[in-house]
């Protein structure tokens, strides 16, 4: 299935059966802001990357480990929240074993991220895969440092919640150029998060064969959201997400 949410993100989700050791149901989760940020070919690269996690051609064992990590994390979250049957015994076992499994499987999981990037490059081109990665990193930083702090400050300064937050975000994504002359040095010097399977941006660009002299041009007038969903549906989603 395909799900839309209000996040600047995309993910391949796995709903496990039998503790994630055999049958799984697959979901592709796409954030509306992501669709509004990217051009259609860049979005195709992102989707191909996520489908690459389902692909078994680049090392079936690494792919299975990647999916098993995702399944176990969701299982642990369900147990911790009391939303799944299983009892205290299962919860104690998973809480004890998960750190060991996480440490030993991280290298394989990161290798699978590179394999998924290869799928993205094969489908949409290495240039589209690279520019999508850079746009997402730049806008994620802008959201954390600029947009969301401004929204929170507005909420504290007025007696009512900010209205149409996601419409404001859509307008900002349409007007912000997010096209630096050169990649910021801080972006290239980011260190890997020990809890994240994704390699650093610099390593992912290098694996794609894209140099650090990459220049990301301003997005064209048509976003992937407008091209694929249509303006009317985008406005309905913005209103729904703003009310939630």
Identify the residue ranges that each predicted region occupies:
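Cytosolic-facing loops and C-terminal tails of multi-pass membrane proteins
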Residues: 85-109, 114, 118, 122, ...
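Short linear motifs at secondary-structure transitions and domain/linker junctions
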Residues: 3-7, 21, 81-85, 171, ...
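A broad detector of the eukaryotic-type serine/threonine protein kinase catalytic domain
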Residues: 30, 35, 73, 98-102
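Catalytic or ion-translocation cores adjacent to nucleophile or general acid/base/metal-coordination motifs
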Residues: 62-80
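General N-terminal targeting signals
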Residues: 16-21, 45-47, 71, 78, ...
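Peri-catalytic and regulatory segments of divalent metal-dependent proteins
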Residues: 1-63, 67
